[in-house]
């Protein structure tokens, strides 16, 4: 059942999150250079506010706390569905970004609600890190630690601080960053291990769905990159800067095939390639994440390198 729910969340809710991201990131930057450009900008902004954000604002709030773990196509809540750490971190990021961009008090209210619930229910107060799933009542269900989930937590909390100035969000993001570096980073070969038990031991199965075969994955590393970029934008720490630069280097050297110009999806702990699958969607996503990270660092040499890889 847990595996089914994990797959459902990733396959059905992830595309919705991508639509939100595209709308939030593109809408402000579409300059009305022509009548057609203005029409496109207005359509994207309207769709984002009236069809996407409004849907989640109307249907996702759980009166008993936080947000429902799953909704039907008509918005009807599945009240007993478990709540995912990644979904809730994305809700936190989404409404924080929406508030920062549009200044709507309703978005601020939802962002604050998501922040409070996430900190109180998803962050492990004993061992650190983020639970993968909690029950509908907010108690832990799957306490495994997935690096992917911890990364999204840093991403969402950093954005909440950026949007609202809430220092608790920044401090929690910093704590999670330090946990990732102390518990998840490979001390021998660098990079970030995929999965752990609650106590940071080796899990019986790898990956968020338990079907993973790789100790290190491209997907996890690009979201560590994304999280560290978001945190560095609001916390100019020298150690974080060094690690952000290192993650950029790992992606462009260990997880990028310079012959095929595709990403390497799955590796063992020594960075040996475990498969020859190409993922065009992740290639596109990473091209943007790399350039964003490089621009956050502000190093012309790194920016040039990342733009070259992105265009290849």
Feature annotation, model-predicted:
Residues 33-312:
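Glycan-recognition and catalytic cores of secretory/periplasmic carbohydrate-active enzymes
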Residues 1-35:
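Bacterial Sec-dependent N-terminal signal peptides
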């Amino acid at each position: 059942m847990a595996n089914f729910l994990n797959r459902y969340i990733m396959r059905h809710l992830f595309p919705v999150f991508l639509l939100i991201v595209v709308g939030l990131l593109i809408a402000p930057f579409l300059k009305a250079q022509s009548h057609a450009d203005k029409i496109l900008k207005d359509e994207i902004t309207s769709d984002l506010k009236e069809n996407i954000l409004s849907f989640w604002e109307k249907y996702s709030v759980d009166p008993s706390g936080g947000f429902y773990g799953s909704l039907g196509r008509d918005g009807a809540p599945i009240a007993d569905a478990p709540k995912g750490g990644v979904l809730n971190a994305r809700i936190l990021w989404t409404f924080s970004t929406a508030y920062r961009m549009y200044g709507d008090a309703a978005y601020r209210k939802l962002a604050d609600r998501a922040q409070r619930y996430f900190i109180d229910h998803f962050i492990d107060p004993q061992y650190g890190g983020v639970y993968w799933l909690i029950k509908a009542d907010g108690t832990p269900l799957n306490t495994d630690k997935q690096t992917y989930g911890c990364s999204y937590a840093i991403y969402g909390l950093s954005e909440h601080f950026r949007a609202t100035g809430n220092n608790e969000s920044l401090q929690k993001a910093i704590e999670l960053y330090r946990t990732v570096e102390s518990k998840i980073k490979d001390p021998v070969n660098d990079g970030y291990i995929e999965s752990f038990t609650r106590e940071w031991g080796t899990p019986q199965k790898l990956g968020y769905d338990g079907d993973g075969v790789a100790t290190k994955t491209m997907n996890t590393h690009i979201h560590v990159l994304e999280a560290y970029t978001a945190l560095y934008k609001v916390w100019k720490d020298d150690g974080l800067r060094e690690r952000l630069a290192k993650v950029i280097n790992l992606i462009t050297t260990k997880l990028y095939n310079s012959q095929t110009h595709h990403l390497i999806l799955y590796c063992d702990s020594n960075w040996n390639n475990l498969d020859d699958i190409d993922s065009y969607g992740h290639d596109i996503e990473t091209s943007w994440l790399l350039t964003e990270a490089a621009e956050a660092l502000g190093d012309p040499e790194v920016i040039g390198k990342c733009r070259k890889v992105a265009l290849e």
